């Protein structure tokens, strides 16, 4: 075991544990944007920087292992100042129209900026424009280049988990951004629309195409007969989302609330999150 001190608290963790993981075992949260354990540990965002006694430079917590006797400060004036500057620089290259963003209230960048008390950005705003910001509006997956913070999560999750290699870096220097790999447009790629990149994007740079208005138009059309179609994953998770105990969150109760339900068990359309087969089978058994 390696013994160290974090914010005055003695911590003992196995050899090879990162500072971020060691802090978590002690109940100390270190802000981060790009980190995904075992998938994206490249410290691209620099938000997890901490102060380590004896080190001249700030140290990224997500990819630096602990050492015996290390003394770490995660919330010292120097650590907070460094973190604040790094977040301000990220915000200077991010479209900060939070009120109209689909991730408002559920955005890691927004949360960290609020925690740091950032109310304005002292740097010139630099957002991609023209061809660098272009995207088709008809594809089910939508990307907003002006919100991308270049954390690389989408690249790594698509490469290492889905093995589809849809995303890659494009451009050089200050013009570096994320785009579809091999100079393709998204509709010509092998994108499976699994939704993993959307799920792991810490901001609103990736989202599903919004067809809400089309649904309302269909509901209002007297020439159309509409029914509700529910995927198995929704049947299993709706109660949790509403804070209902499992014995109350039954399929029958949901069907009664929706008045008309066409159960698509066994042939649901693909959804953006993976379904647990055991849960689906349990639901089928209830029937």
Q: What residue ranges belong to the model's regions?
A:
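Iron-sulfur-associated redox domains of electron-transfer enzymes in respiratory
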Residues: 2, 10, 15-75, 79, ...
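Residues at alpha-helix termini
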Residues: 25, 115, 160, 203, ...
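Short glycine-/small-residue-rich flexible loop motifs, especially phosphate/cofactor-binding loops
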Residues: 20, 110, 155, 198, ...
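Fe-S ferredoxin-like electron-transfer domains
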Residues: 46-193, 199, 206-218, 224-225
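A short alpha-helix capping/helix-coil boundary motif
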Residues: 1, 133-135, 175-177, 232-237
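ABC transporter nucleotide-binding domain catalytic core, centered on the Walker B motif
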Residues: 7
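Short, basic, glycine/proline-bearing loop/turn elements
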Residues: 201-202, 240
């Amino acid at each position: 075991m390696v013994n160290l001190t974090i914010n005055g608290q003695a911590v003992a963790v196995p050899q090879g544990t990162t500072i971020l993981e060691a802090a978590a075992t002690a109940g100390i949260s270190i802000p981060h944007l790009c980190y995904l354990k075992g998938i994206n540990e490249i410290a691209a965002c620099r938000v997890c920087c901490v102060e380590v006694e004896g080190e001249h430079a700030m140290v990224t917590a997500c990819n630096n292992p602990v050492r015996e006797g290390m003394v770490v400060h995660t919330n010292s004036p120097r650590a907070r100042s460094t973190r604040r500057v790094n977040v301000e620089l990220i915000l200077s290259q991010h479209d900060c129209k939070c009120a109209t963003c689909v991730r408002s209230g559920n955005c890691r960048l927004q949360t960290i900026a609020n925690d740091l008390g950032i109310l304005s950005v002292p740097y010139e705003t630099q957002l991609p424009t023209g061809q660098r910001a272009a995207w088709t509006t008809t594809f089910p997956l939508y990307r907003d280049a002006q919100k991308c913070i270049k954390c690389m999560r989408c690249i790594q999750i698509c490469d290492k988990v889905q093995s589809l290699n849809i995303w890659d870096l494009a451009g050089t220097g200050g013009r570096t951004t994320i785009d579809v790999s091999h100079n393709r447009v998204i509709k010509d790629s092998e994108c499976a629309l699994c939704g993993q990149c959307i799920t792991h994007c810490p901001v609103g740079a990736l989202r599903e195409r919004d067809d809400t208005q089309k649904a309302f138009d269909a509901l209002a059309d007297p020439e159309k007969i509409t029914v509700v179609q529910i995927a198995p994953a929704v049947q299993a998770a709706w109660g949790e989302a509403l804070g209902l105990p499992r014995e109350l969150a039954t399929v029958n109760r949901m069907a009664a609330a929706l008045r008309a339900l066409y159960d698509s068990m066994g042939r649901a359309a693909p959804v953006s999150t993976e379904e647990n087969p055991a849960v689906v089978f349990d639901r089928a058994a209830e029937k």
